[in-house]
């Protein structure tokens, strides 16, 4: 069996049903103060919190209405200020770009030549004039990513130096709304801005205020996905359902993260470790929370315009994408992707799925794409989580995780090692298929060199963010 078939078969075994199963009953992981003093919320508890936040969502809707005009003005400013990036496309022009398993049968080479929007014969197709306007907006943004020295403002989703550190939760939600809008999904799937706002608000409330694994991280990862799709011109190639799937998965991939790793959950014999048989414990937990939100009233409103088949494909992709963020399986996915590069076909749905997986996995560890000062902040945040876990491991007489021990970690060396082992090879593989990502690879190399010559205590840690 071909390597890509192996991995897709493995992924598809997670659930044969086209729709998500009901959420597991009470997955509360409750340790007392002598053990962890840290709870991993159950899906039921998360649902209760979601209900409590509905009133807040209504307030956010009102605030969003006031901000819409500002968003539009900022979008125009983004378009005017963006620096054009030359797109180099290694993929042969005679490759058919597109039949995915979403029933999108009309994608072809005309997608890149004519920059047609990817509406794919939806029943409620937009009027021709609106479609042309949407295409023009997409084209004005494609391959226009702000330079490395730009200031970050509240709506600067086009900047490689996007930073969520100084942003409030409302600002981050606004960034998320803009990413949906600039991705073309409003018109392609007839999504309403209010449903997206409500969804993002409930997602934001389902993240904990961790040093690293927080809503800030989720939006940073999602913005990286946005930049990748923009820079590679894949907004004009991927189907609307593929785009929706990876954006939703990016935003939700660390929901209710306890800032304690899979290894810790397993060694502690936590409730979620038992529930998921010690396999991708946190990733399954994040997925459960995500599916609970998507199955709620707010989720149903968000997906109300999708057909039955589109929902089936959407849920399938969200599942495989979130589960793929388990770094224990990193090299397996990397090898599977490398094996298909030379024969990659846009007509092969498994190839497309694996490409999306590599996008999300790479974006999840992409702090080194930012300027050094921004990535340095992420470094310290992740180290804070790691050191806290190490303290708890000692307190509970658990096996110590080597790269988390305060006394042994040399941060700049740890960072260089991670870049060389995980981050850089991932982006180099993506560049082999999509040459326009060369700038991203060069930025990673530049930051690696800074770490190589830096013995300070500051470092951008990228060790397994699970």
UniProtKB/Swiss-Prot annotation:
Compartments in which it is found: Cytoplasm, Cytosol
Any matching Pfam family: PDEase_I
Cell membrane recorded as keyword: no
Binding residues annotated for a divalent metal cation 1, in chain numbering: 217, 253-254, 364
Phenotype of the disrupted gene, per the record: Shows a moderate phenotype with increased basal cGMP levels, but only a small effect on cAMP-stimulated cGMP levels.
Keyword terms: cGMP, cGMP-binding, Cytoplasm, Hydrolase, Manganese, Metal-binding, Nucleotide-binding
GO biological process entries: cAMP-mediated signaling; cGMP-mediated signaling
Domain PDEase: 137-458
Free-text cofactor note: Binds 2 divalent metal cations per subunit. Site 1 may preferentially bind zinc ions, while site 2 has a preference for magnesium and/or manganese ions.
Compositional bias segments (type: Low complexity): 1-120, 135-150
SMART domains, per database record: HDc (SM00471)
InterPro entries: HD/PDEase_dom, PDEase, PDEase_catalytic_dom, PDEase_catalytic_dom_sf, PDEase_CS
Disordered: annotated span: 1-150
Residue ranges with Acidic residues bias: 123-134
Molecular functions (GO terms): 3',5'-cyclic-AMP phosphodiesterase activity; 3',5'-cyclic-GMP phosphodiesterase activity; cGMP binding; magnesium ion binding; manganese ion binding
Cofactors required: a divalent metal cation
GO cellular component labels: cytosol
Superkingdom classification of source: Eukaryota
Documented EC number(s): 3.1.4.35
PROSITE patterns with a match to the protein in the record: PDEASE_I_1, PDEASE_I_2
Notes on how activity is controlled: Inhibited by 3-isobutyl-1-methylxanthine (IBMX).
Main localization category: cytoplasm
Known role: Phosphodiesterase specific for cGMP, which is not activated by cGMP. Involved in the degradation of intracellular cGMP.
Record family assignment: Belongs to the cyclic nucleotide phosphodiesterase family.
Protein name: cGMP-specific 3',5'-cGMP phosphodiesterase 3
Species assigned in the record: Dictyostelium discoideum
Designated gene of the protein: pde3
């Amino acid at each position: 069996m071909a390597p890509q078939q192996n991995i897709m078969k493995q992924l598809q075994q997670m659930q044969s049903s086209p729709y998500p199963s009901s959420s597991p009953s009470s997955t509360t992981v409750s340790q007392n103060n002598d053990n962890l003093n840290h709870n991993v919320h159950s899906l039921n508890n998360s649902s209760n919190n979601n209900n409590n936040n509905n009133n807040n969502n209504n307030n956010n809707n009102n605030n969003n209405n006031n901000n819409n005009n500002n968003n539009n003005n900022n979008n125009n400013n983004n378009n005017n200020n963006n620096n054009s990036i030359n797109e180099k496309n290694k993929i042969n022009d005679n490759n058919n770009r597109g039949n995915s398993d979403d029933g999108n049968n009309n994608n072809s080479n005309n997608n890149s030549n004519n920059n047609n929007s990817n509406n794919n014969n939806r029943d409620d197709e937009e009027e021709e004039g609106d479609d042309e306007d949407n295409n023009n907006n997409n084209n004005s943004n494609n391959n226009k990513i702000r330079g490395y020295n730009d200031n970050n403002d509240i709506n600067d989703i086009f900047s490689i130096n996007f930073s969520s550190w100084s942003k409030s939760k409302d600002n981050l939600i606004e960034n998320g709304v803009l990413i949906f809008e600039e991705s073309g999904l409003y018109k392609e799937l007839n999504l309403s801005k209010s449903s997206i706002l409500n969804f993002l608000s409930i997602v934001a409330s389902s993240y904990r205020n961790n040093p690293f694994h927080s809503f800030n991280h989720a939006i940073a990862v999602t913005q990286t996905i946005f930049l990748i799709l923009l820079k590679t011109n894949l907004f004009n190639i991927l189907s609307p359902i593929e785009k929706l799937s990876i954006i939703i998965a990016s935003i939700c991939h660390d929901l209710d993260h306890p800032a304690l790793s899979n290894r810790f959950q397993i060694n502690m014999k936590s409730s979620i470790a038992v529930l998921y048989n010690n396999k991708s414990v946190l990733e399954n937990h994040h997925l459960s929370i995500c599916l609970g939100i998507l199955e709620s009233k707010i989720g149903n409103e968000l997906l109300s315009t999708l057909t039955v088949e589109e929902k089936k494909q959407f849920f399938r992709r969200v599942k495989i994408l979130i589960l793929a963020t388990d770094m224990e399986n990193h090299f397996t996915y990397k090898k599977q992707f490398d094996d298909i590069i030379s024969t990659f076909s846009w007509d092969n749905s498994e190839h497309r799925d694996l490409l999306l997986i590599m996008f999300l996995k790479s974006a999840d560890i992409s702090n080194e794409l930012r300027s050094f000062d921004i990535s340095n902040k992420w470094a310290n945040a992740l180290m804070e989580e790691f050191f806290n876990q190490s303290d708890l491991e000692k307190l509970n007489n658990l096996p110590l995780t080597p790269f988390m021990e305060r006394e042994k970690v040399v941060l700049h060396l740890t960072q260089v090692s991670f870049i060389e082992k995980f981050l850089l090879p991932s982006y180099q593989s993506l560049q082999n298929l999509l040459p326009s990502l060369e700038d991203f690879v060069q930025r990673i190399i530049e930051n690696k060199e800074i770490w190589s010559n830096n013995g300070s205590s500051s470092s951008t840690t990228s060790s397994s963010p699970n």
